[in-house]
Amino acid sequence: MYRKALLGSTRLDILSYISSMEEDREIVEEVIECLIAHVKGLIHSKLIPEEEGEKILKALEELRASKEALFSIEAEDIHEAIEIYLKEKLGKTGGYLPLGRSRNDHVVCALRLKAKKALVEEIGLILELRKALIKKAEENVYTLMPLFTHLQPAQPSTFAHYLSAIIEELEDITKILFSGLGIVDKSSLGAGAIGGTSVLLDRGYMGGILFSDIITNSLYATSSRTFLLYSCFLSVLISIALSRIAEDFVIFSTPNFGYIKLPNEHLSTSSMMPQKKNPVTMEVARAWAGEAIGHLVAMMSILKALPSGYNLDMQEVNKHAFALFSGTIKTLKIFVDAMKRVEVNKENMKKDCDIFPILATDYAEKIAMNTGRPYREVYMEVASIIGEHESTEKIYSELSSKYGISISLEEGIKKPVVGSPNPEDVLEFLEKAKKNVEKDEKKLEELRQNENRDNVYNP
């Protein structure tokens, strides 16, 4: 359609090579929303006859319910397909639509809407995950477990303390996601192809239908994908955090550890070995983080060193962004379900606390403080005693005999510093965590209410 007057038709194989129609399935809803805002802006500024504008709005609203019809049209992209559709449906009236509009400002508008919706959904799912973690932590404040460095038993803790670390990380990620929305939630409508338009559009009015602000500079509005890279980076950040939890859960669910039992729906068996219970959802989540990083690297590789202004290279970025949003949201849903229903084996956790000399640091610190001797000197003595014995019981027995002190696991977790596994500290943290969830839920609800703007045509 666009090329006909200047270039004539092209071959189908070439059209297929440059077309983004399949990828545009992901943003067809957002493209229509942007067009509705644009037409409302044209009517508002009295740039087209109101009656004709209302016909276009009605047709666009009807198109929302029958979007699949667009994908039988031969077109470079969804924007061209919609214009072809409107021309066939409305005749000349459809020709009012593109006044003051370019695909360049409209694809950015659609991508920003898509990214905004993805961030909002990610925040909502992270809030669900935080609530599930808090509930599970409250049930396990006194559930002893070893913590690990280098995957070696390190110090005594509780399962609640372990989960609290995840909760606090997700709180920080939530803050970053809210911050990201401030960057994404801006309108490009009215920026034209690159240098604006001579049509006197009210950019603030159009932008206010879908966004909370506008991008001022028309070149930046149409040719930058920083907003998309940033929102995709946030999806990668989430995915990496989840992959580390997934790795822990894969390890903790093995018979060798036996700390947790994942829901049966999250497990798969072997085609040959009837005893196998494989933690497949966690394995896929672990792999997804690698894929997510790959998508982000592909996006950055495409965008780096592009000249200013729109280039069709940018079209190739979109499929990676869509995959990132979709994959991260799916993975979050898996974790919400798994965390709600995971079972904890307190006996196995406690058993490993007894088997390994994870109180060694507590002994060394207490001896140093009791005697006033340099810690490194005491550390060396404790390490030597550990090296002489295979049995944890014998290690503790000699330390107690030699230095006249005895430390239990329960004492070992009751450390005086803030943020330790001390049950009092953990309970206090969990109370704050619940309040933080409530604050973030309120913030998200306010954001969703603000998004419930009248961007739907009501004849």
Curated annotation (Swiss-Prot):
EC number, as in UniProt: 4.3.2.1
Biological classification of the source: Archaea, Methanobacteriati, Methanobacteriota, Thermococci, Thermococcales
Q: Where is this region: Disordered?
A: 440-459
Entry's Gene3D superfamilies?
Answer: Fumarase/aspartase (C-terminal domain), Fumarase/aspartase (Central domain), Fumarase/aspartase (N-terminal domain)
Q: Superkingdom, according to UniProt?
A: Archaea
Where in the cell is the protein located? Cytoplasm
The reaction(s) catalysed by this protein are: 2-(N(omega)-L-arginino)succinate = fumarate + L-arginine
Q: Name one Pfam family in it.
A: Lyase_1
Q: Which organism is it from?
A: Pyrococcus furiosus (strain ATCC 43587 / DSM 3638 / JCM 8422 / Vc1)
Q: Molecular function (GO) terms listed?
A: argininosuccinate lyase activity
Indicate what this protein is called per its UniProt record: Argininosuccinate lyase
Q: Which InterPro entries match?
A: Argininosuccinate_lyase, Fumarase/histidase_N, Fumarate_lyase_fam, Fumarate_lyase_N, L-Aspartase-like
* UniProt entry keywords in alphabetical sequence: Amino-acid biosynthesis, Arginine biosynthesis, Cytoplasm, Lyase
Residue ranges of coiled coil: none
